[in-house]
Design a protein with these regions (language model features):
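Well-ordered secondary-structure scaffolds
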Residues: 2-187
Length: 187
């Protein structure tokens, strides 16, 4: 149970699909001291519904919540005071972590690697998806695939993503493959 008046500083690395979802859920839960960290050239499949779009546009709005690109941690602190938007920093390597000193760090990059992750990064370090080991790289891993999606693992790794979507018991049959290499152009 959270202490009344206490709001931990939560840093989320990755503002794509998963990071945006995590940020929205935390915000709606009343945890408003959030910072999103993103790389200089983020890639997202659904660009109009991810906070990483703020890297290109200066701001991005998803489900009524705005993320705003900040030049530094001072600008992040100013946004926390006003509550106008979520601060987003371009900081792929996490250089701002030393200055921010978060209580919680969430890796939502889905990189399938423990890229510089350590349980010492914050009081609670969480990673989403496969390739990262709970108990060694982070405190816990959130399962992002299969029947246990959303489960918090305190030891071991999440299931490896096969890359083949499965629905109603059909997997490979649902995947369309290009007959040859090349660039597809639509009229």
């Amino acid at each position: 149970m959270m202490q009344k008046g206490f709001c931990p500083l939560i840093v989320i690395r990755g503002a794509g699909d998963m990071g945006t979802g995590v940020a929205l859920e935390l915000w709606h839960a009343g945890l408003h001291r959030l910072v999103l960290l993103e790389c200089a050239r983020p890639r997202a499949i659904r660009r109009l519904v991810v906070f990483s779009e703020a890297v290109f546009e200066g701001k991005a709005r998803v489900e009524g919540l705005e993320a705003r690109l900040c030049p530094d941690t001072a600008a992040c602190r100013a946004l926390w005071q006003t509550g106008e938007a979520l601060p987003l920093l371009v900081d792929e390597d996490g250089a701002s972590l030393r200055e921010l000193c978060p209580q919680v760090f969430v890796d939502a990059t889905m990189s399938k690697k423990a890229r510089g992750l350590s349980p010492n990064m914050a009081d609670l370090v969480i990673a989403l998806g496969p390739g990262i080991e709970a108990g060694r790289d982070v405190h816990c891993v959130i399962e992002s695939f299969g029947p246990d999606m959303g489960r918090c693992l305190r030891q071991g790794q999440a299931l490896a993503n096969t890359g083949i979507p499965c629905e109603h018991g059909r997997s490979e049959q649902r995947v369309g493959r290009a007959p040859c290499a090349g660039v597809f152009a639509s009229p």
